[in-house]
Amino acid sequence: NPLIVHIADLNALAPIVKEVPEKAKILAEKFWPGPLTMIFEKSDLVPLETTGGLNSVAVRFPSDPIAAELILQAGGYVAAPSANTSGRPSPTTAQHVEEDLGDAIEMIIDGGPVGIGLESTIVDFTEDVPVVLRPGYISLEMLQEVLGDVRMDKGLIKPDSKVHPKAPGMKYRHYAPKADLAIVEGPTEEVINAINQFVKEDQANGLQAGIIATEETISRYPCGTV
């Protein structure tokens, strides 16, 4: 997988890419610093080891002040993956990182819990029309509201293992918590009663339960996280 190059200053973008399209500048002004990664044609300053052998580079400008200071102390650029095992969800606390990676890393910088538990949205600007390669916190609708024509990558619908991924998280499954999932179907009252019974049984066994509900039924679940 290619790595994301993290910057802490907009002026750091130009030296590592061949060109910054106008639409990319618009997104940078709207969403940077923040959970948005953009892909450009790389300059000669970016080694192929960083890009996974591709001629493009993924760049992100994070909003966390501690991350920004780390990047600046490292010389203005940090090429790195997310702090989680491939296929696992993004951590939101230092404890999550320690539980997932353990002795595989030498140090954790604890900046407190983060507010967003999703990977950054990745938008490819190497094509004529911007393409979302990885969905994230910034939705397709939010991007289209700013730019107009933005498309979803066809590989998100039908992944092709033979295609070299242009961005992290495209090759393997993503957002995969270690949890059982049950879909309850049927008449509304029966669904509500069944879900409440499932949650009570889980809690009696010392488990935590989360419920995804509609606005019409959300008040009918007294237990669990709704």
Please report, for each region that a protein language model flagged, where it lies by residue.
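Active-site-adjacent structural elements in enzyme catalytic cores
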Residues: N1-V226
